[in-house]
Swiss-Prot record:
It is found in: Cytoplasm. One of its GO terms (biological process) is SOS response. This is UvrABC system protein B. The keyword Acetylation does not apply. The lineage of its organism: Bacteria, Bacillati, Bacillota, Bacilli, Bacillales. A motif (Beta-hairpin) lies at residues 92-115. GO terms for molecular function: ATP binding; ATP hydrolysis activity; DNA binding; excinuclease ABC activity. SUPFAM superfamilies: C-terminal UvrC-binding domain of UvrB (SSF46600), P-loop containing nucleoside triphosphate hydrolases (SSF52540). SMART domains: DEXDc, HELICc. One of its GO terms (cellular component) is cytoplasm.
Length: 661
């Protein structure tokens, strides 16, 4: 079993990286539960975390707040650890519409999803790696706190094959069917097997190119080979191979029988309650749907939406904690939370959103109450898995600050780059002033980011700049992740000189060519101009030796003051370090990478379908109040998660609603 991490890099830790690595390693050795790496933009936080992983040598889970960011981290860690198991675990849905019911219009929305096969393979590769070795790093999105099958069942049902092992061919076939492999002699793909005389070929769920060929002599395995599934080329002989289940929700036959009995019992109880409350239509609907699922489970061993019965399949009591990816890790694993100021609130919010939707389904007879136990972890359940956790952020949130007694600061950049200088200029004449600044940057072949407060202002500014001949593009929330990465690439290549947007805090905007970040209406206190957002936005100009930030404002707000002072403090620290070590700041020379494959596989931005404002005139006063409250709550949550376009859209809708009401 391979169990050492090997870090491969031509760089050595520099600046204050060695100090940060030493402090974090010491903290873990001393058994500190919570630590925070407060790392300024561009200080090489991923490299620091890689060194930490190598030193403490524990299986590690890195949680990012969306698939794109997870994809970027996956490619970086893969470069640092080419000889270890770096895995990727995100939601495998390219498109996902959860089942839901709208009582007002009596509309049931069926679950509709398309599963990305590449990501499903990567998920299986991640869970199987955890059972085979200790040198595992899994980069995951928040989907790692969603329910999976039992790790004990998963481990127990692994089919282990060795050369000279005595097993009948038909018994092997039965075992493969039990772990949800399908026999398919024609279309040979992931999760299937085919039989040709005394040869059984198995295509593991965690692979996409290589299959396993098992050759029998009578009732004995004569030879096990790894074969290229497409060309048939033999890649090597194996003494032993472990075939992991093709689904994370595998259940033994005797357990399945018990689960079916429990589901039937729950169904009878729920039908009784519904009849007593006069819910006859709901009772009929529930019985019809559940009986159909039970029939499928008896005949096929699974049914559509089997995860809704996961509590029964794992024989857990009501309300108990579901199994998740975290349970597949050994007890001494380490968690790294990237961009923790966004990720932690996201983990916290998952449970409530899921329960609200499922409760409606249960109340109206679409699901049994046990479906509520197929859920993401509550935050306090997630906390129970925190043995060693490191939060990584340039602007740690309240949770991290409260739980960490001492921040590990990483302010010095290996390149000697300083935090940008900040100018505050009056709002009057801001556009003309901005155009002058843009022209100066274009002459020096540098790029500009401009952040505005509203969608309308972004659009108007973009149109105006285009009219006067400036190469500009507008980054808005409807742009898909991959398209967004391409626009950023085009900015770097010089197809555009200026990018305008509301939320310039999304991942992938660390662009060395950007020497100016302009913040319009910086004194309009609110979620778009909070101290945390401002510090993050200022960081966008910290990759260039000429980096500068201009805030257009008529007064200096509290948030502006905090952000300006923090930037000044960091800059002074960086200048001191450069003087002591004779370092001259150099703009980062970062290759313009093509979009990585894991990101392509994960291409999926959280899609928000902003509904048209509901007609308040048709609602009662109570309903009206409820809609407004819900939208205000959503707006605040979106702002907390730094998803400002969504928050701004909701804010505009709220104003519309209030005007109507």
């Amino acid at each position: 079993m391979k169990d050492r991490f090997e870090l491969v890099s031509k760089y050595q830790p520099q600046g204050d990286q060695p100090k940060a690595i030493e402090k974090l390693v010491k903290g873990i050795q001393e058994g500190k539960k919570h630590q925070t790496l407060l790392g300024a933009t561009g200080t090489g936080k991923t490299f620091t975390v890689s060194n930490l992983i190598k030193e403490v040598n524990k299986p590690t889970l890195v949680i990012a707040h969306n698939k794109t960011l997870a994809g970027q981290l996956y490619s970086e860690f893969k470069e640092f650890f080419p000889n270890n198991a770096v895995e990727y675990f995100v939601s495998y849905y390219d498109y996902y519409q959860p089942e839901a019911y709208v009582p007002q219009t009596d509309t049931f929305i069926e679950k509709d999803a398309s599963i990305n096969d590449e990501i499903d393979k990567l998920r299986h590769s991640a869970t199987s790696a955890l059972f085979e070795r200790r040198d595992v790093i899994i980069i995951a999105s928040v989907s790692c706190i969603y329910g999976l099958g039992s790790p004990e069942e998963y481990r127990e049902m692994v089919v282990s094959l060795r050369t000279e092992m005595e097993i009948e061919r038909n018994e092997l076939l039965r075992k493969l069917v039990d772990i949800q492999y399908a026999r398919n002699d024609i279309d040979f793909q992931r999760g299937t097997f085919r039989v040709r005389g005394d040869v059984v070929e198995i295509f593991p769920a965690s692979r996409d190119e290589h299959c396993v060929r098992v050759e029998f002599f009578g009732d004995e395995i004569e030879r096990i080979r790894e074969v290229d599934a497409l060309t048939g080329e033999i890649l090597g002989d194996r003494d032993h191979v472990a075939i992991f289940p093709a689904s994370h929700f595998v259940t033994r036959a005797e357990k399945m029988e018990k689960a079916i009995q429990n589901i039937e019992k729950e169904l009878e109880e729920q039908l009784k309650v519904m009849h007593e409350n006069g819910k006859l239509l709901e009772a009929q609907r529930l019985e019809q749907r559940t009986r159909y699922d039970l029939e499928m489970m008896r005949e096929m061993g699974f049914c559509s939406g089997i995860e809704n019965y996961s509590r029964h399949l794992t024989l857990r009591p009501p309300g108990s904690t579901p199994y998740t990816l975290l349970d597949y890790f050994p007890d001494d694993f380490m968690i790294v939370v990237d961009e923790s100021h966004v990720t932690i609130p996201q983990v916290r919010g998952m449970f409530n959103g899921d329960q609200a939707r499922k409760q409606v389904l249960v109340d109206h007879g679409f699901r049994l109450p046990s479906a509520l136990d197929n859920r993401p972890l509550r935050f306090e359940e997630f906390e129970k898995h925190m043995h060693n956790i490191v939060y990584v952020s340039a602007t740690p949130g309240p949770y991290e600050i409260e739980h960490t007694d001492e921040m590990v600061e990483q302010i010095i950049r290996p390149t000697g780059l300083l935090d940008p200088l900040i100018d505050v200029r009056p709002i009057e004449g801001q556009i003309d002033d901005l155009i002058g600044e843009i022209q100066a940057r274009i002459e020096r072949n540098e790029r500009v980011l401009v952040t505005t407060l509203t969608k309308k202002m972004s659009e108007d500014l973009t149109d105006y700049l285009k009219e006067i001949g400036i190469k500009v593009n507008y980054l808005h929330s409807e742009i898909k992740t991959l398209e967004r990465i391409e626009i950023i690439r085009d900015l770097r290549l010089g197809k555009y000189d200026v990018l305008v947007g509301i939320n310039l805090l999304r991942e992938g905007l660390d662009i060395p060519e950007v020497s100016l970040v302009a913040i319009l209406d910086a004194d309009k206190e609110g979620f778009l101009r909070s101290e945390r957002s401002l510090i993050q936005t200022i960081g966008r100009a910290a990759r260039n030796a000429e980096g500068r930030v201009i805030m257009y404002a008529d007064k200096i707000t509290k948030s502006m003051e905090i952000a300006i002072n923090e930037t000044k403090r960091r800059r002074e620290q960086q200048e001191r370090f450069n003087e002591e070590h004779g370092i001259t700041p150099k703009t980062i020379n970062k290759e313009i990478r093509d979009v990585i494959r894991a990101t392509v596989a994960a291409e999926d931005k959280a899609e928000y379908k902003t509904k048209a404002a509901p007609k308040l005139s048709k609602m009662t006063k109570k309903e009206r109040q409820k809609v407004v409250e819900q939208m205000e709550h959503e707006m605040k949550e979106a702002a907390k998660a730094l998803d400002f376009e969504r928050a701004a859209e909701l804010r505009d809708l709220l104003l519309e609603l209030k005007a109507e009401g």
